[in-house]
């Protein structure tokens, strides 16, 4: 059962990038990849900052922290989990900078993804809404599609959790 979560980052992505790329959690850094940026935390941070400055984006949201967790009963190698994280970013956020890191230090394998908030082609910020094509509901849909391709279990009919209520 693949579970996804996404939250906005404010001020700086660096702290999150340093955490997710920790060599003690990522098989010595072998399970860290950069998409449209360096896999190195400091370099990726600088590249993301440069992209924000290029498009003069000064908003509060600097990026997003995406968490993708897999059921410990699923037969999944570290490399396959990492491939799923990379493929999720490539399908859903192809024009964004991201660092994908697979953590293997716990009983359950999980991915952390730091995604820059700025589209490298348009300069527009990611649309942070539940139902938009870049939104959390589509994150789950794409993650579930890829998980099924790898023969993993997915949650059935679980609505997205929205902390805001009417």
Indicate where each model-derived feature is located:
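N-terminal nicking endonuclease/strand-transfer module with a His-rich metal-binding environment
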Residues: 1-166
């Amino acid at each position: 059962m693949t579970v996804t979560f996404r939250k906005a980052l404010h001020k700086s992505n660096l702290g999150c990038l340093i955490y997710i790329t920790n060599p003690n959690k990522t098989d010595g850094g072998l399970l860290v990849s950069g998409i449209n940026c360096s896999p190195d935390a400091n370099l990726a941070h600088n590249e993301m900052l440069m992209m924000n400055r290029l498009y003069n984006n000064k908003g509060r949201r600097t990026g997003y922290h995406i968490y993708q967790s897999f059921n410990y009963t699923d037969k999944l190698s570290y490399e396959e989990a990492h491939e799923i994280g990379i493929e999720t970013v490539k399908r859903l956020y192809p024009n964004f900078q991201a660092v994908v890191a697979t953590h293997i230090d716990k009983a359950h394998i999980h991915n952390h993804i730091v995604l820059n908030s700025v589209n490298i082609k348009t300069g527009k910020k990611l649309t942070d809404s539940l139902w938009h094509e870049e939104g959390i509901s589509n994150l789950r849909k794409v993650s579930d599609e890829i998980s099924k391709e790898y023969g993993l279990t997915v949650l059935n009919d679980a609505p997205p959790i929205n902390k805001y209520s009417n």
